[in-house]
Curated annotation (Swiss-Prot):
Keyword Membrane: yes
Source organism of the structure: Pectobacterium atrosepticum (strain SCRI 1043 / ATCC BAA-672) (Erwinia carotovora subsp. atroseptica)
Membrane-topology descriptor: Multi-pass membrane protein
Localization per Swiss-Prot or TrEMBL: Cell inner membrane
Single annotated GO MF: symporter activity
NCBIfam families: PRK13499.1-1 (NF010021), PRK13499.1-3 (NF010023)
Primary localization: membrane
Keywords: Cell inner membrane, Cell membrane, Membrane, Sugar transport, Symport, Transmembrane, Transmembrane helix, Transport
Entry annotated with the keyword tRNA processing: no
Function text: Uptake of L-rhamnose across the cytoplasmic membrane with the concomitant transport of protons into the cell (symport system).
Protein name: L-rhamnose-proton symporter
InterPro entries per the UniProt record, alphabetical: L-rhamnose-proton_sym_RhaT
Catalytic activity: L-rhamnopyranose(in) + H(+)(in) = L-rhamnopyranose(out) + H(+)(out)
Family assignment from sequence similarity: Belongs to the L-rhamnose transporter (TC 2.A.7.6) family.
């Protein structure tokens, strides 16, 4: 396995670790509605950071974006909005299925759809079955799905041991939302593929290959921001029991602490895709669709590791922990299979 491929896998792991940890600062926010907290964190992760970093990277910010026609930008933006819808469905999935089953189904679906639909849309799917490297990467995707399923089962055992139930358990609603979440969340993978002309243009300007994907985030995350912020603002304006005015009426020290924690959560959220771009840059051109599989499977892996480190599995018994460790090992095996497939 070559060094660039190993680096690509490593950076995807770092990005996934940031994704697994980003909600920790949000948990420190007190006496704010979820909508206010998510909007502030999201404003930094979807707007401030993508724009600031692109402004710093690009020699002429406005000329760069003005060089693309609407036929190029609109699909990227819409795929970003599609991914934003997936974000909203994610929370609803947890409500109706619980964390473990919800994550298992949603991540499993988005891993498969986001990974395999890209080569299908490119007309390259049959090529994967006809080459040893393609066959091995497909095997790695299958093993990753199995690993995600095992970790999710471990989480289900943990929830049962701790007596945790979904807020409003509904298998029918939850399954529909989980599948929708998985499909729509794959929009980020499609957006990255559609943004290749933007990556090429950034590289032509002399931008380091590790950073060429970052300017496209202005458009991709712009689509996601409109969906997420619109959803939050509508709820703040129409739902009884929550209001921006009430959230901002808290004592000044609490306001400052809440704002800092929300911003930190937003920064950590953005870092997952910052390092996703680094990992993506090191993946061979014929296998860029694998980036999504690596990111999502490592996200589940890192979520399990973070749970162990924070002693969330302390009182659940040995079987759930053994299943968690087994699932993590299977995901690591999947990453190695995919890496070997890309190296063939």
């Amino acid at each position: 396995m070559s060094n660039p491929i190993l680096l690509g896998i490593f950076w995807h792991f770092i990005g996934a670790a940031s994704a697994a940890c980003f909600y920790a600062p949000f948990k420190q926010v007190k006496n704010w509605s979820w909508e206010t907290m998510w909007s502030l964190g999201g404003f930094f992760s979807w707007i401030i950071l993508p724009w600031s970093i692109s402004w710093w990277l690009l020699p002429d910010f406005w000329r760069y974006y003005g060089s693309f026609d609407m036929a190029t930008l609109l699909p990227i933006f819409l795929f970003g909005a599609m991914w934003g819808i997936g974000n909203i469905n994610y929370g609803l999935t947890m409500r109706y299925l619980g964390m473990s089953m919800g994550i298992g189904i949603a991540i499993g679906v988005t891993l498969i759809i986001g990974t395999l639909m890209t080569p299908v849309l490119q007309g390259k799917f049959s090529v994967l079955f006809g080459s040893p490297g393609g066959q091995m990467t497909l095997l790695g995707v299958l093993v990753a799905v199995i690993g995600v399923a095992i970790v999710s089962y471990a989480g289900l055992l943990k929830e049962r041991a701790l007596g945790i139930r979904a807020e409003e358990f509904s298998l029918k609603k939850g399954l529909i939302l989980a599948v929708m979440c998985g499909i729509f969340s794959a929009g980020m993978s499609f957006a990255m593929d559609a943004a290749k002309p933007m990556h090429t243009a950034a590289q032509a300007l002399g931008i380091n290959s590790l950073y060429v994907a970052l300017p496209s985030y202005v458009v991709i995350m712009g689509g996601g921001a409109i969906v997420n912020l619109g959803f939050c603002f509508i709820r703040l304006a129409t739902c009884k029991g929550i209001s921006l005015k009430a959230d901002l009426a808290q004592a000044k020290p609490l306001l400052i602490a809440n704002a800092l924690f929300a911003i930190l959560g937003g920064v950590m959220w953005y870092l997952q895709f910052f390092f996703y771009a680094w990992g993506h840059a090191n993946i061979p051109a014929d296998y860029t669709y694998i980036s999504w599989m690596l990111h999502m499977s490592f996200y589940v892996l890192c979520g399990g590791i973070v749970g162990l480190l924070f002693k969330e599995w302390k009182a659940v018994g040995q079987k759930p922990v053994r299943m968690l460790v087994l699932g993590c090992v299977v995901i690591i095996l999947a990453a190695n299979i995919v890496g070997l497939g890309m190296a063939v």
